[in-house]
């Protein structure tokens, strides 16, 4: 994921 991206920047969770």
From Swiss-Prot:
The organism of origin for this protein: Anthopleura elegantissima
GO cellular component: extracellular region
The protein's name in its UniProt record: Antho-RIamide-1
PTM sites of type Isoleucine amide: 4
Modified sites of kind 3-phenyllactic acid: 1
Domain of life: Eukaryota
Keywords for this protein: Amidation, Neuropeptide, Secreted
Chain's role: Inhibits spontaneous contractions in several muscle groups. May be involved in the expansion phase of feeding behavior in sea anemones.
Locations listed in the record: Secreted
Presence of the UniProt keyword Methyltransferase in the record: no
Location, primary (coarse class): secreted
Tissue spec. comment: Neuron specific.
A single GO BP: neuropeptide signaling pathway
